[in-house]
Amino acid sequence: MRNVKVLLLYPKFPKTFWSFKYALPFIGKRAAFPPLGLLTVAALLPKEWGKKLVDLNTQKLNEKDINWADFVFISAMVAQKESVKEVISQVKRFNKKIVAGGPLFTISYEEFLNDIDYFVLGEAEVTLPLFLENLKNSTLQKIIKPEPNQWPDISQTVVPLWELIDMKKYASMSIQFSRGCPFNCEFCDIILLNGRVPRIKDKIQILKELDALYNLNWRGNVFFVDDNFISNKINLKEKVLPAIIKWGERKKHPFIFNTQVSINIADDKELMDLMVRAGFNTVFIGIESPNEESLKGCNKFQNINRNLLESIRIIQNQGLEVQGGFIIGFDQDTPSIFNQMSLFIQRSGIVTAMVGLLQAPPKTRLWERLRKEKRLISQPTGSNTDCTINFQPKMNLHSLISGYKRTVNHIYSPKNYYQRLMNFLKEYKPRVKRNYQLTFERFLAFLKSIWILGIKEKERVYYWKIFFWALIKKPRLFPIIIEMAIKGFHFRKISEEYSKITTH
């Protein structure tokens, strides 16, 4: 097989809660995270093949790159759908063969049958070798997908081909320890994409991936993209985390880790202690709702029969900042949910609280139930913060959308955001002292925060209050406070933009 040239394309994300569009300019970055899936796919391709990666979140796609390629590989999430359509249209003008994979196509490839030449669906470790074999034998098939419950052993997965991107354009790098989630939330499509039995990498592989980032001179944030990092606690506590701790000590702690976990981490002090010692300082938790009936209705049983506020307090007391995901629009929600949600978030001290409207992703249990009830309206947009909903809710639609907008604007108003930040600082107790390096990048972000947040924008009064309070009371946390002030600016701008959207 001749040396094939592959252009790997990552479509653009719209402005969303997690895009950090208004925060990234403070630190001179163009995107929050790199396309980990495509970088892994690139590493799975034959070494002798030519490879280029264009992330449309950091650079423009030019005709020269398209002309260069024999194949164009596209991977995307649902939120990138509009950009995907534009990319397909652009590439097809050059008569190039398009190969598509990733979450969007795995769940909804039927939508793109007329536009895509070949689909390589599911996890690439299973289906990409089949595509390569078929290409070698000139027997290419339109659709390659895994057998039901066919999941790869990810301990054999290759190290992502980081050399294809310009790391300086990103705020964080990404790494993966596990795939799959043992829980069965009605609205979640993770079990469709990755299964319910968590599969893990061994400690040797994790250290190899950390070494790869370190040797390419990356220093700073590293996001473990696992949907539930603590799905295999025994392995984490006995093998992986102790290995990361030793690695970090040898390398003088070059990385700050964050990840996603379930609320039951609050029940395991040993695990939290090991994570903090390994360098973790932030965990995202799907709290979803303060309404226990809504939690039961969506099968979020890991969140019931516990005091959620106390669990959050325990985690933050242990030195892990909790970022929270919340959902409005469950069948059990009444108009009281808006005030209930706002009050819970304020009391929790969760500074980064992502409140979204319930969406029904295709083929999930929620989608199937709503289909049987004839309540589906459209495909989801992939963003649950854009004031759209793809089914007929039990609550009056106008009341739901307007109540949602009020809730988001309330929690991200400067007064409430900075009050929540203060509540967090009172509970947060960093257990491990790390040397904070004042880089030029961070110093520039600090100066920009003074000008934009402290002088130009509406949060200036609250910014200066917490600025001087932190200098006197919590000088050790001062860099974190400035970072959170910058994030708050982004969240406010996004919530204000979405609140102007008219819905019918």
Regions found by a protein language model. Give the residues of each.
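Acidic, low-complexity intrinsically disordered segments
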Residues: 2-218
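Structural recognition of alpha->loop->beta junctions
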Residues: 111-130, 274-282, 342-355
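Radical SAM [4Fe-4S] cluster-binding motif and immediate context
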Residues: 156-323, 328-330, 334-343
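Conserved beta-strand positions
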Residues: 8, 74, 121, 224-226, ...
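Amphipathic alpha-helical segments that form well-ordered structural scaffolds
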Residues: 40-44, 243, 406
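A C-terminal junction/extension of Radical SAM enzymes
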Residues: 54-58, 147-151, 155-157, 321, ...
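Flexible glycine/acidic-rich beta-alpha junction loops that bind and position SAM and/or redox cofactors
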Residues: 13-19, 108-110, 183, 232-234, ...
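Radical SAM enzyme core and accessory elements
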Residues: 2-8, 50, 65, 135, ...
